[in-house]
């Protein structure tokens, strides 16, 4: 897809194994006439959050990107780096 991303949906996560799939699916089901991307800031969860997010990113590489690091950076830095990775004209936060 070469058209510009209009909306970047920012999701920051830490140990959200129970909720992450539902949150991602809620964005993927949106019907729009513009391009949406999901940018997930995964902050070294100790559960399966990262694995679930990576599975979705593999299934939808044109729509989902994951921002990670080798160590937990905390919620504030996680938000900043995830927003910085956004390509959209507009940003939506999904907590």
Where are these regions (language model features)?
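Cell-envelope/extracellular polymer assembly enzymes that use nucleotide-activated donors
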Residues: 6-8, 37
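Short, well-formed alpha-helical segments that are part of the catalytic scaffolds
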Residues: 16-29
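Conserved short acidic donor-positioning loop in nucleotide-sugar-dependent glycosyltransferases
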Residues: 27, 43-44, 73
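A conserved acidic beta->alpha catalytic loop
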Residues: 42-51
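Active-site acidic Asp-centered loop
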Residues: 43, 94-95
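Glycine-rich, basic loop-to-helix element that forms the pyrophosphate-binding segment
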Residues: 69-86
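Short aromatic/hydrophobic "clamp" motif used to bind/position activated sugar donors
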Residues: 91
